């Protein structure tokens, strides 16, 4: 199938427009700052001393200021959840844009790493030029104490140098601990190192307070390149001759452009010596707003989550899947949202996000999550919830004499799956444990489907073995029977795909016989599936939601952008559980 521009604009248009705006801001800031320090008269003397390193260091710093402010905004989860649920964002396309917050965070992080490298390299050159081009006439301009001072002293004995080295170390730890391998194998390392961001920002505010780079303040009485009245220059002294007496060693900036500007005229006579002053730090202007917003949100979340939940029951499902049912006063959530669990007995500072598989309603206050035991945190959490003698039991009711650990929740927070009920037709695709975000959607339909726009749901679940399916089969079985009894058999189209066949007839045939016709061996034929959905829903907009491996996600994403002969538009949404 050929690319559909209609579908592509729906899925990618706003995202690429925002990317273009962000990229334009970065380029504009970099170029404007570069030209300012390269051609600005107030930076003439410092530019002659440092050359290109000055321009690159300041231009990269402006890009860092922008991205260090933007990177915090996607982490304001409560604000994003409020915007998604409020009437102030009525457009579904705008709400879908909020789901790209993680992408913006990662993009800004990569940009910070790249331009930090440029910034560090430029300042290494600056340190060398400060030492080599030491000026005896403009002492206030020097960062070095004498000519040919060891540049390493500038890096490790000055506030900007020392804080810069510390920031590079902190940034290196945060970046290396953010890799997929570390997040999966040892989430603790990722969590603790990422919380070093506060140290990074404090160092950043100290870094810009050093005032090593200075600009000229008295341009009216001392035009750049002039000579003062207390000197008697030779009649034909040029600007290059004059400045060469003030700066020892090579001049990295050169004077060809300056000679052209003055048309090789004699140096002007000035009224006083140049005066230099350090810039007032501007970084705090960039980051103070987002940083205060983030800190205020964290404070609000801390207050909101300071009361522990009451654990109603713990269910140990096959395939190392745990179900946790809880209750908390005044807790409200929408289908598709997620919460963050914090168990001090497992880790004092570590938190983990889990999608709600059961939301509270007007008639019941119970809510729950499912999680797969993978990684050190979930293993320790499982051991606290289940006593050793009950590891293989199915359910531990609340009335049992069991002392559960204290558990705190933060949230709820928004996710793309909130939109699944706002389409007339939705296609939900899950891979393995990625089925959990859809559990709350199905539970909501089981309670009452009439208030929502959704009238047809295609539910596709790809599992490795039958035990992965077993813990979710009860909900699918009840939901399937509900719509058959209400004479709406086409409301939910369930398709289950398993790659292993051992024991299928024994387990499925006895308890969930009505799902036998929905069970398939192998993998879905995605292109045929999309063609069938497009044919049955001509001219409609279908919401595509995926939570699973990247291979499935990429396939669905590509098919959503493809053209079809039925006028059906597919809008792609994705949630990552990695």
UniProtKB/Swiss-Prot annotation:
UniProt EC number: 1.6.3.1
GO cellular component, as recorded: apical plasma membrane; cell periphery; endoplasmic reticulum; endoplasmic reticulum membrane; focal adhesion; mitochondrion; NADPH oxidase complex; nucleus
Catalytic activity: NADPH + 2 O2 = 2 superoxide + NADP(+) + H(+); NADPH + O2 + H(+) = H2O2 + NADP(+)
Tissue specificity note: Expressed in vascular smooth muscle.
Keyword Membrane: yes
GO molecular function: heme binding; modified amino acid binding; NAD(P)H oxidase H2O2-forming activity; NADPH oxidase H202-forming activity; oxidoreductase activity, acting on NAD(P)H, oxygen as acceptor; protein tyrosine kinase binding; superoxide-generating NAD(P)H oxidase activity; superoxide-generating NADPH oxidase activity
Annotated function: NADPH oxidase that catalyzes predominantly the reduction of oxygen to H2O2. Can also catalyze to a smaller extent, the reduction of oxygen to superoxide. May function as an oxygen sensor regulating the KCNK3/TASK-1 potassium channel and HIF1A activity. May regulate insulin signaling cascade. May play a role in apoptosis, bone resorption and lipolysaccharide-mediated activation of NFKB. May produce superoxide in the nucleus and play a role in regulating gene expression upon cell stimulation.
Assembly description: Interacts with TLR4. Interacts with, relocalizes and stabilizes CYBA/p22phox. Interacts with protein disulfide isomerase. Interacts with PPP1R15A. Interacts with LRRC8A; this interaction prevents the ubiquitin-mediated degradation of LRRC8A.
Protein name: NADPH oxidase 4
Lineage: Eukaryota, Metazoa, Chordata, Craniata, Vertebrata
């Amino acid at each position: 199938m050929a690319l559909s521009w209609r579908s592509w604009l729906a899925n990618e248009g706003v995202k690429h427009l925002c990317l273009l705006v962000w990229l334009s801001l970065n380029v504009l800031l970099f170029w404007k700052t570069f030209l300012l320090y390269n051609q600005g008269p107030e930076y003439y003397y410092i530019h002659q001393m440092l050359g290109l390193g000055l321009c690159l260091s300041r231009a990269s710093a402006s890009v860092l200021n922008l991205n260090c402010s933007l990177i915090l905004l996607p982490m304001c989860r409560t604000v994003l959840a409020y915007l998604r649920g409020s009437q102030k964002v009525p457009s579904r396309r705008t709400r879908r844009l909020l789901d790209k917050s993680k992408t913006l965070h990662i993009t800004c992080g990569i940009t910070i790493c790249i331009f930090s490298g440029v910034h560090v390299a430029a300042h290494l050159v600056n340190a060398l030029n400060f030492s080599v081009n030491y000026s005896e006439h403009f002492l206030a301009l020097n960062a070095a104490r004498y000519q040919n001072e060891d540049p390493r002293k500038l890096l490790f004995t000055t506030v900007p140098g020392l804080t810069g080295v510390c920031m590079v170390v902190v940034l290196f730890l945060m970046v290396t601990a953010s890799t997929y391998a570390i997040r999966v194998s040892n989430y603790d390392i990722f969590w603790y190192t990422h919380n070093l961001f506060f140290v990074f920002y404090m160092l950043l505010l100290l870094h810009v307070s050093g005032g090593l780079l200075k600009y000229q303040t008295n341009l009216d009485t001392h035009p750049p390149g002039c000579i003062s009245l207390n000197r008697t220059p030779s009649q034909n002294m040029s600007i290059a001759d004059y400045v060469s007496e003030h700066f020892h060693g090579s001049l990295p900036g050169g004077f060809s452009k300056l000679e052209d500007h003055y048309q090789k005229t004699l140096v002007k006579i000035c009224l006083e010596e140049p005066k230099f002053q350090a810039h007032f730090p501007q970084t705090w202007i960039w980051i103070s707003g987002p940083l205060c917003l983030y800190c205020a949100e964290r404070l609000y979340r801390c207050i909101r989550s300071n009361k522990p939940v009451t654990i109603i029951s713990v269910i140990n499902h096959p395939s190392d899947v745990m179900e946790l049912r809880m209750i908390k006063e005044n807790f409200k959530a929408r289908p598709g949202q997620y919460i963050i669990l914090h168990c001090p007995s497992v880790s004092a500072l570590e938190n983990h996000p889990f999608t709600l598989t059961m939301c509270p309603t007007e008639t019941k206050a119970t809510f729950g999550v499912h999680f797969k035991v993978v990684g050190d945190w979930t293993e320790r959490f499982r051991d606290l919830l289940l006593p050793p003698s009950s590891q293989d039991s199915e359910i531990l009711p609340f009335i049992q004499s069991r002392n559960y650990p204290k558990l705190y929740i933060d949230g709820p927070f928004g996710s793309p799956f909130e939109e699944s009920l706002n389409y007339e037709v939705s296609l939900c695709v899950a891979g393995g444990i990625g089925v959990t975000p859809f559990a709350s959607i199905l539970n909501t339909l089981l309670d009452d489907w009439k208030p929502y726009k959704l009238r047809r749901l295609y539910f596709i679940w790809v599992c490795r073995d039958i035990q992965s399916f077993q813990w979710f089969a009860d909900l699918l079985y009840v939901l399937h029977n509900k719509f058959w009894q209400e004479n709406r058999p086409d409301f939910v189209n369930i398709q289950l795909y398993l790659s292993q066949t051992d024991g299928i007839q024994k387990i499925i045939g006895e308890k969930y016989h009505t799902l036998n016709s929905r069970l398939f061996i192998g993998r879905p034929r995605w292109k045929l599936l999309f063609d069938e959905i497009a044919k049955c829903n001509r001219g409609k907009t279908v919401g595509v939601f995926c939570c699973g491996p990247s291979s499935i996600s990429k396939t669905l994403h590509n098919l959503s952008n493809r053209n079809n002969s039925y006028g059906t538009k597919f809008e792609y949404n994705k949630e990552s559980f990695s």
